[in-house]
């Protein structure tokens, strides 16, 4: 099976995380961010992740792809997230975007290798509220908010020696979003949460974004 993805994308990371934890092998194809032709040919629009199966059929919803992986692995894991994970996710995107949007194109990520892809990113993602220059200038204030958010997250996950009782899908949700915050080195990670994140990265073979 072939997965078309971006390295920075939390929904792509979620799919890769589940595949890695279940031992499902994927041919991961990271698209250039300004490549509209490939995804449009596959699903009619520019969106990832896209799973292309061996028989040529495609899937483009991360939840559906994850459900397929759970089924293929014969796993008893639930394909539904808990309400707690859903609510946490709803409050997580603001800090993630404030940190990630101006920084991810500066990392050594395949989707941003070309100047045209970085320009396309800025054109698509920058707004009055999320102005990249202003976000970088506001780093100290944003980091303070993120630090508090991470403390609350660690308490919610009830981590013990780097492990939790989370389901596979809930773990995928938390991990896929939190990994995107590692691109800002001044963020202070609570010890147990940082230990859990690094352990999950090793187990799933999905690296943290730094």
PLM feature segments, named:
Residues 194-210:
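Short, mixed-charge aromatic SLiMs
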Residues 1-122, 159-161:
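GST-like domain detector, emphasizing the conserved glutathione-binding G-site
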Residues 42-44, 74, 129, 186, ...:
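Glycine-centered secondary-structure boundary/capping sites
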Residues 74-83, 124-135, 206-210:
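Short secondary-structure transition/capping segments
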């Amino acid at each position: 099976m072939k997965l078309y993805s971006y390295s920075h994308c939390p929904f792509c990371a979620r799919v890769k995380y589940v595949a890695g934890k279940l031992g499902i092998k994927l041919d991961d194809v990271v698209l250039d961010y300004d490549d509209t032709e490939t995804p449009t040919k596959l699903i009619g629009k520019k969106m990832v992740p896209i799973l292309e199966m061996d028989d040529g059929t495609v899937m483009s919803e991360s939840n559906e792809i994850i459900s397929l992986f759970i089924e293929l692995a014969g796993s008893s894991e639930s394909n539904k997230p808990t309400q707690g994970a859903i609510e946490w996710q709803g409050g997580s995107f603001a800090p993630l975007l404030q940190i990630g949007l101006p920084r991810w194109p500066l990392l050594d990520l395949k989707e941003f290798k070309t100047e045209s892809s970085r320009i396309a990113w800025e054109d698509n993602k920058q707004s009055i509220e999320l102005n990249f220059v202003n976000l970088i200038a506001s780093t100290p204030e944003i980091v303070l908010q993120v630090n508090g958010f991470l403390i609350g997250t660690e308490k919610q996950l009830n981590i013990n020696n780097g492990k939790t009782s989370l389901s596979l899908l809930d773990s995928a949700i938390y991990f896929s979003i939190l990994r995107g915050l590692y691109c800002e080195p001044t963020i202070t990670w609570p010890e147990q949460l940082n230990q859990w994140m690094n352990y999950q990265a090793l187990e799933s073979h999905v690296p943290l974004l730094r």
